[in-house]
């Protein structure tokens, strides 16, 4: 347990479905179903699966933001952070005194930098906001931290005085990464962080995240549907299907010797530039569609 930074035990997320004249609950959607994961410190875990598999819901459950948009959602089980310097924190039973600590230790990078950055705020204030909320640092210390973070993500301190619309998509995602790192977190949840970017920019952002992960010994949960990207960045992979983790293991092992039929179908459906065997791969993509029905 000493190397475990985050433990997920029997996690379930249910969204009630209401119907009838009086809008009573008539059924539930089980978005996450009995998920168990032990996540080691300093690792990058790829969470993969098609749309609707529950991977983004899992990330939002860990960051504890589901009820902000779905107040009727039911989340039960255990999500335990082991910060090593303090007592363990169970996010589903969190104490008021632990909230700031947890928000500092666990941060999230969202999929769309165009909507995740406040267009009315200067970039420096966007990056500084987590420090304003979760720390008691002085104004000068915060400004120095912002300048340092901008440099770390490949931007410069002068750009702190600009607005998000003045940046490209790749630069915006660099700003989002800087914001996530502001409080020196132990765990970063990256929810499809490059899917909205051009392929050439994707590679730059992925390489940046890998460099930062190594430099700061970050634990990253990298949520994605692009298996090629996940293979490049992840040390371990969890494959989700219909809310369940159907396969979990070392990245190379999962790619070279997948055990679950769904994992095999996902891997076989990866686009390949070689025209030889195109029909066979087309058949595998059709099989994946049938698998999802």
Predicted regions and their residues:
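Short catalytic/signature loops enriched in Gly
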Residues: 2-4, 17-23, 88, 250-293
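ABC ATPase NBD Q-loop/coupling interface
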Residues: 78-101
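Conserved ABC ATPase "signature" region
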Residues: 82-87, 140-158, 267-268
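Conserved ABC ATPase signature
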Residues: 163-167, 171
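A short, proline-enriched helix->beta-strand linker immediately N-terminal to the Walker B motif
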Residues: 182-186
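A short, surface-exposed alpha-helical micro-motif characterized by mixed small hydrophobic
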Residues: 230-232
